[in-house]
C-alpha cells in the first residue's frame, strides 16, 4: 500500500509537470500516457510488479489517463531498454520501472529520451539520477522492525524465523529491522522470543 501511494503521488506530480505533454502518437486527446515495464514477473505477482501496476492503474483512473504495461522478452538490460523504447515509440512519456533490476536500463533511457519521465522503484541509481528521473526508495528496516515487534507480541515466547525473497538490499534491510523488532520486544515488552539471525 505504501508503495502504491508513493507511486500515485509521483504520477500525479509528473502529470502536473508534463500536462502539456507529448503531441506525438497516442496522445491525440492530449492525455498523458502512463506505461510500466515489468521485470521477469507478471502484474499479479503480489510483489513489485503488482504494487507498481496498481499504482499506475489508480493514477490513470483518478486522473483520467491512459495506461498500459509491457513484459519484456527477457531479463537483460537490453530487454528492459527495448521495452522502455517500445513504450516511448508509442507515445508514452511517463514510464514506471519496478525494482533494482532496471537500474542500468533507466540510466540509459534517461539520457536517450530527455522528454521521458521515468520512475524507478527500490533503487537510488548510484550511476546518477537525471533531471527526468525519480528514484523511489523505502525504509524497509522500519517496516521490518514493526513486523518483528508484532510477531514477538503475537507469539510471546518460542522460536521465530524470517524467510525473505531474494538476497537483495531491500530484503536484507527488512530482515535486519525484523530482528531488531524482536529484540526490542524482548527487552521492552515482556516477550521471550528466540531468533536465529542467520535465517
Where are these regions (language model features)?
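Short, low-complexity disordered leader/linker segments with a strong preference
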Residues: 1-32
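A residue-level marker of the well-folded mature domains of exported/periplasmic proteins
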Residues: 20-199
Amino acid at each position: 500500500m505504501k508503495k502504491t501511494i508513493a507511486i500515485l503521488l509521483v504520477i500525479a506530480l509528473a502529470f502536473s509537470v508534463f500536462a502539456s505533454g507529448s503531441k506525438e502518437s497516442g496522445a491525440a486527446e492530449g492525455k498523458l500516457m502512463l506505461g510500466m515495464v515489468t521485470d521477469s514477473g507478471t502484474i499479479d505477482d503480489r510483489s513489485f510488479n503488482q504494487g507498481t501496476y496498481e499504482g499506475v492503474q489508480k493514477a490513470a483512473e483518478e486522473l483520467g489517463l491512459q495506461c498500459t504495461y509491457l513484459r519484456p522478452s527477457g531479463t537483460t538490460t537490453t530487454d528492459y531498454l527495448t521495452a522502455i523504447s517500445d513504450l516511448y515509440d508509442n507515445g508514452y512519456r511517463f514510464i514506471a520501472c519496478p525494482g533494482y533490476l532496471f537500474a542500468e536500463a533507466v540510466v540509459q533511457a534517461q539520457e536517450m529520451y530527455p522528454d521521458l519521465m521515468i520512475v524507478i522503484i527500490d533503487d537510488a541509481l548510484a550511476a546518477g539520477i537525471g533531471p527526468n528521473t525519480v528514484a523511489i526508495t523505502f525504509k524497509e528496516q522500519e517496516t521490518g522492525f514493526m513486523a518483528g515487534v508484532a510477531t514477538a507480541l503475537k507469539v510471546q515466547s518460542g522460536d521465530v524465523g524470517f524467510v525473505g525473497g531474494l538476497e537483495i538490499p531491500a530484503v536484507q534491510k527488512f530482515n535486519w529491522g525484523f530482528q531488531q523488532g524482536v529484540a526490542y520486544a524482548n527487552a521492552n515488552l515482556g516477550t521471550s522470543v528466540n531468533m536465529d539471525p542467520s535465517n
